[in-house]
Design a protein with these regions (language model features):
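Thiolate-centered catalytic microenvironments shared by cysteine-dependent enzyme domains
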Residues: 2-8, 53-145, 210, 215-245
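Short hydrophobic beta-strand that contains or immediately precedes a catalytic carboxylate
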Residues: 17, 25-32, 48, 155-162
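His/Asp/Glu-enriched short active-site or ligand-binding loop at hydrolase and phosphoryl-transfer sites
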Residues: 179-185
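A short, acidic, amphipathic alpha-helical segment used as a generic capping/interface helix at domain edges
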Residues: 192-205
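Extended hydrophobic/aromatic segments used for targeting, binding, or gating
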Residues: 194-195, 236-241, 245-264
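Extended interaction-bearing regions that mediate binding to partners or small molecules
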Residues: 288-339
Length: 339
């Protein structure tokens, strides 16, 4: 099998993957559940449910999985999921951790692939086992001990990729919250290079910093962030793969905001004129709605039909004196809530 285009870039476009499928020059891995895979998958894809890898993610186990899937050291690999890239990111990282060089994320989910009208199949390819060595890549992994040692270093940035309320409730001291949903753009699992660079710049994160990402437990959401950073050429990125669950179980220090609630999320709202570029579409927002001005009764009625959250409604709107940081309004005046 030949190497993929742009081997240093961890993302492959759906257009290029289609060409590689026709050439039969690539190993494609679908990390959805088996029953989902059986109902239809990208042509020539083999199945690796993420749970199988997470059940034992030791280097030896990852090596065996790779070999059983017909992956040798030289095999070009593309991985996809139907979960905004988080599950596939974790598998890409695992292969890179044992030293596999040519492995990439597909830039769309399976659903997006289908929406593009691209070919799918229910045929299961035959797999010829291969031989794969293990050459651990320690530079891409952070442990709890390492994180505790470097978290006070000014050249180290820790990013928490959980949803903001989880972050507010408790997080690793000094961590900056970049929720995983802010990493995507319309029709793709990740922002454009320019969009990602703008996000980092506006959060005050220098591109020459050492960046460590973490999430809740197994490194899926933070794995997506890891590759978002690598996709724009950030050289020194590590994944704290066992993430906050391990950190808390080890009784490491944590920071938290007492009595955190949904109003504390206001700092994550974006100006409506920018919303298509920086956030998911409004129908996907589950806990509120951003408006350019105080909502009319008609607008409230529309929202009640659109964005329920446990039977309660929250709207945030801008006044003239709202400060904007990274397109995020910091609410200074009114906050409306409707039951």
């Amino acid at each position: 099998m030949c190497s993929m285009i742009d081997s240093d870039i961890p993302i492959i476009s759906s257009k290029i993957l289609r060409e590689k499928i026709q050439e039969n020059s690539i190993r494609i891995i679908d990390v959805r559940r088996d029953q989902e895979y059986q109902q239809g998958h990208i042509t020539n894809a083999v199945n690796l449910p993420l749970a199988k890898l997470l059940n034992d993610d030791s280097p030896e186990s990852i090596q065996k999985i790779a070999q059983d899937l017909g992956i040798s050291n030289e095999t070009p690999v593309v991985i996809y999921d139907d979960t905004f890239g988080a599950l596939s990111s974790r598998v890409v990282w695992a292969l890179q951790y044992i030293g596999h060089k040519d492995v990439k994320l597909l830039d769309v989910t399976f659903s997006q692939w289908k929406d593009l009208g691209y070919e799918i199949s229910t045929e299961v390819p035959e797999i010829e086992p291969a031989t794969h060595s293990v050459k651990i890549n320690p530079e891409i992994m952070a442990t709890a001990e390492y994180l505790e040692k470097v978290k006070e270093n000014k050249n180290v940035v820790i990013i928490d990729n959980r949803e903001r309320l989880n972050y507010l409730e408790q997080h690793i001291p000094g961590a900056i919250n970049i929720p995983y949903r802010t990493l995507a753009t319309d029709g793709k699992i990740l922002r454009t290079k320019e969009g990602m660079k703008t996000l980092l710049k506006n959060r005050g994160i220098p591109e020459d910093a050492e960046i460590i990402t973490y999430c809740g437990s197994v490194g899926t959401l933070s794995g997506l962030a890891y590759y978002a950073l690598k996709s724009i050429g950030i050289p020194n990125v590590k994944l704290y793969v066992h993430s906050f669950k391990e950190w808390k179980n080890l009784e490491k220090p944590i920071d938290k905001q007492e009595n955190a609630n949904y109003w504390d999320l206001s700092a994550e709202w974006y100006k409506m004129k920018d919303i298509n570029d920086v956030m998911p579409k409004v129908p996907n927002m589950k806990w509120g709605a951003l408006l350019n001005k105080k909502p009319t009764n008609k607008k409230i009625e529309e929202l009640n039909n659109l964005l329920p959250h446990n039977g309660r409604w929250h709207t945030v709107y801008e006044e003239d004196d709202v400060s904007i940081i990274d397109g995020v309004p910091i609410i200074k005046k009114e906050k409306d809530s409707m039951t």
